[in-house]
Structure formats: C-alpha cells, structure tokens
Amino acid sequence: VGSEMCIRDRAEEYALVPDAFVGVTPKVVVKEGVHVNSGDALFVNKACPEVKFASPVSGTVTAIERGERRKVLCVKVKADAEQQATDFGKKNVDVLDGEAVKNALLEAGLFGYINQLPYAVSTTPDTKPKAIFISALRDMPLASDFEKELEGNEDAFQAGLTALSKVAKVYLGVGIDQHSRALEEAKNVEVNVFDGPCPAGNVGVQVNHIDPVNKGEVVWTVDPSAIIFFGRLFLTGKVDLRKKVAVAGSEIKTPGYAEVLVGTPLSAFVADQLKATEHVRLINGNPLTGVQTDMAGFVGGHTSEITAIPEGDDKDEMLGWILPRTSQFSTSRSYFSWLFGKKKEYDLDARVKGGERHMIMSGEYDKVLPMDIFGEYLIKAIITGDIDKQEQLGIYEVSPEDFAVAEFVDSSKLELQKIVRDGLNTLRKENA
C-alpha cells in the first residue's frame, strides 16, 4: 500500500454497523430525531446490556435501518457542524486496577471492541481472561501497515496497553520487519517477534504458539487500532474513533491511507479512487477475510483496509485451465507461472474458478495453517456436527480468519471460514 494520504472532507452522515461486532445481538437505545454526543451509546448488547457501543460523532439520529426479521443493519447519525463529545474524565492508567479499566471502557462504549477466544466473538465483562493478545502484524494480502496508523498515536497506544495490563498479562505480537519504537519498546507487555508468511500475523496463530486455549479458559484478543481508542479515552476522557484505513487493490487509482472515523461512508473517500464502476469487487477488509460491500457501506469497527479487485465476470478465457498460462497464480503448479518465482505479482480477481466438491486432496490445509491442530479433520468434524471430535481437535483455539489462506488454496472450493463460524456458533449455543 502506498504511503500517500487520501485527504477527504468530513462526511455528513455516519453509521455504526452492529455486524462489525461478531456475536453481538444489538438492542437500539436511541430513537430517530434524538441528538447524541460522540461517546453516547447507540445500541447495546442485548445479552449483556452493560456493553454499549458508542456513536463516533455528535449529531442527530436520522435512521435505524432494519433488515429481515427486524435485524438492525445500522444506526445512522447526521453529524453536527461543531462536534461535541461526552467527557468521561481523564484517568491515570498507572494507578487504575483491572475493574476500574473495565468499567471505564464499559461506560464509554468501547468494551465491545474486545474479542475473545473461544468462539472468536465480542467478549463480555464477566469473562476472566488468562491473557490478552494483540497482534500489530497485519500480513494478509493488501492489508494496512499498523506502523502507519501508529504514527502520532504512540502515547495513546502505550496508555491502552498499560490499561489492559491491569486486567491480565498482555502479549504484543510484532513482525520482524516492524521497527517502531512504540512496538519494540512497549512497556507492561511481553513483546513477541514473529517471522514467516501469512497467516503469521493472525492473533489466533500467535495464541496457539504462546499460550494455547484449553476448554474452560478464555483469552481476550484486541485489534491494535482499538488499543489506540482505549488510550485516547484514558488520556483525554473522550471517545475518539479516528483511524487510518488503507485503500488498496488493483482497481484503486492511487493506493494510500485515509484518516477516517469508524462509521464513515465508503462513498466519502473511496468513490473517486476507483478506476471503474463496473466489474469491480469492493471489499470491506482484505480479499481473504473481508466482506463484499458497495458504496452504501461504512467503515466498520474493526476495518483496517478497504480493497477493490476485479470481479472477473467480464473475462472469457479460451479453453480455461487447459492452456499453459504464465499470468495465472496456482499453488499446485498447474500453470507455468511458478517458474517466475515467488516475487512475481499477480492481479487476482474474485472468481472461484471451480465448484464445490468432496475433500479428496489431503494435507493442503496443513501447509498454510501454522497451528498445532489438524485443520482438515477439524473441518470434517464441524461438517458432520461431531462436537466431541471438534473439542478434541482444538476448535476452542481457532477463529474463521485462521482458515482464510487454507480456504484460498483449497482445491475443494469449500467456504472454510463460514464452516468454522457456523461450528463456533453452534458450540457457543451448546455451552451457553
């Protein structure tokens, strides 16, 4: 991703999207026409009402959009010309205890940005984590560089780390090529350096290598952007959800970074960056773990990049895979492109190139799943609904994103991330 900043005017309307917080069933606590400050709750977790979700801006609630079965899709707020923020009071993180930290995050509507293993869902304050994991290494294709976001936010990042260290031991994972002092010299945490290809940056992979999750145990996982949100809260007493989001992909004119708020409409900073308006796949996130979106979408609570790649629906390749192509990527060396080495770049599109089929090829997942689990057998156990087998094979340690690369190379074309998510949801209901 380029380093050029995409400077944009502030949008008129913002929206908080509940789907960005996995495992949360939202209960809206505002009505249309009501005025809110930034930091005021727009909705809460129905299962745990003390977990609030804060408005990114001050303004008037203009719409509560619902989908099928009245599912809340988003809460929209028209921003004031002069922004007002609820003041939660500055706090010295050095003297706070764990309960005070949790209460501060709950009051300000930021606690929901913390996820947990098992189940890979937004956590609740009654969980007792044995450790907290943060991965500053983003190594998915077209992912943003967290060091870009860290620039100018070093103090807030450290304050957030110190605050969480009062709750449990904090492990910070960094990449071998990351040299920001705020990462290398982070205080009150254990810094672990990771070297290797994607998915080395996945927080689940790091948990598996450092302190695996057994049945009955819980660890918290936090996106590094949220650590900055937490730190700003303690340093200023106010909710500030600004972040740098990468705008990348072969369909983007000038890849770079946009400084936006959570809830910013994509149309405000992506629309004039697209090379074309047709035959383009716009993704909220990276191509492997992101969600298909369009210009009506918004920056989610955990969004770190917006990517655009060719859809591929306008391609008509004569004789398909039979021709010995040199510009097509293949993990199984089906094309001669492997002769050009690993540094050759490819312009991949969104086509699946094949239909779903039985799992015949063995060992495919293990090559790209650097965890001490049998990925293939775990997937089979989830498909067959064998909960005992799933537990034995380590389902409590995984999240859907851990299978993203495996899904990409899978010759069976299975939606592995969806399979894992469905399995985790079923297990969560069984153990509730």
Could you tell me what each predicted segment is?
Residues 50-58:
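Short coil-to-beta-strand transition motifs
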Residues 25-35:
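Short histidine-centered loop motifs in beta-beta connectors
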Residues 14-27, 44-45, 250:
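Short, structured beta-strand/loop micro-motifs enriched in basic residues and often containing a Trp
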Residues 2-6:
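Short, small-residue-biased leader/transition segments that mark boundaries at the very start
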Residues 51, 65-432:
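Buried, small/hydrophobic-residue-enriched core segments of structured protein domains
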